[in-house]
């Protein structure tokens, strides 16, 4: 699976998830493969003006799988993005993806309560391609809330139907 194909799926899923804190979703980067000067990714803008990004990185051979855990507070945007993405994938079960897991990358992040923080999502595709999608974040012009402003958010059922929106044939001119 190509990086762009995986990012197409992720972008469609973020849009279908309709999270109320996400105000804009944009693609960026020109690289077709991880490791270049312009990594391909998706940037999500939040109500606070901060952003979180999921981008294709070269997999680290010592990346350590981590359990999903609880949703972290808004100030940890990169971590929230990873947890939200995992939760969305759990609901959507996209056919091209065989499995996904959070990973800690050696030398990235810190230790929280004796455990490393996640820094990436490892996706194993059905064609045996392994994608390593790193998460990073930027600050916004407003302070992040201390607690989740949308604690009752549930991933909508429409996420299960994402593939119908992405792969449906166009009703072009005949």
What are the functions of these language-model segments?
Residues 25-51, 108-128:
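Amphipathic, interaction-prone secondary-structure segments
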Residues 1-29, 48, 54-110, 139-174:
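Intrinsic disorder/low-complexity detector
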Residues 57, 126, 136:
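Structured beta-strand/turn binding interfaces of compact recognition modules in eukaryotic regulators
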Residues 133:
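Conserved catalytic cores of phosphodiester-cleaving nucleases, focusing on short active-site segments
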